[in-house]
Amino acid sequence: MAWNFGNILDTIIPVLPEGHLALVHGDREITWAEMGRRSNNLGRFMLENGASIGDKVGFYMRNRPEYMETLAACFRARLTHVNVNYRYVADEVHYIFDNSDAAVVVYGKEFRENVEILRPRLPNVKLWIEVGDGANLPADTYDYENLATSGKGENLKVAREGGDLLFLYTGGTTGMPKGVMWEHDALRETQTMALRALGDVPETLDELKAH
């Protein structure tokens, strides 16, 4: 089985202790099991409603649990994360989503005004998903929480590859932001090289499960 972050999540979540926390944000606490179910539900929804393997997913949010859940959903559904600095103005956000050919955009409700400016300029975006309270959603927009909690949370039956991609856009200090493409197995190997200096590290998913 390939070293892919989706496979890693599928491997470790079932063997973690009940109640083991994955995300803590203020008063919110989300266990690994909860994040696993929610990310599977979200990933399945995207694949069943217009997104295809390898499609880009634009993240237009502040740091919050939904960001990490959506990232996990992308890993598990073989979709490609595209980051954007939430401080960007509409034209800058448009550049990144257009340049990356984003097919899905997940955004925080506080950015709705900018998103409404962007929609007509991004005709190739198939799904708009809003993270908020679900109130007064714009037309053709899905409520994140409803998607994350709808379904059984079962693992996706997707054959992943180590060459699946993760996009990280640069800050654009020497021009416009550039989309740096990381393969899952290359990013994992970079992390593992540093960890080897501290001792033995798992070399297979089976070793990881037993670690």
Regions found by a protein language model. Name each.
Residues 1-3, 136-164:
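Flexible, low-complexity linker/hinge segments
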Residues 31-33, 165-193, 198-203:
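Conserved AMP-binding A3 loop
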Residues 21-64, 68-72, 89-94:
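Conserved AMP-binding/adenylate-forming core of the ANL superfamily
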Residues 150-171, 175-176, 202-211:
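Conserved pre-ATP/AMP-binding loop-to-beta segment of ANL
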Residues 10-11, 47, 65-84, 93-94, ...:
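Hydrophobic alpha-helical segments in the ANL/AMP-binding
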Residues 48-49, 76-149:
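Structural core segment of the AMP-binding/adenylate-forming
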Residues 9-31, 136:
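AMP-dependent adenylate-forming
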Residues 57, 74, 105, 170-173:
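Conserved S/T- and glycine-rich ATP-binding loop of Class I adenylate-forming
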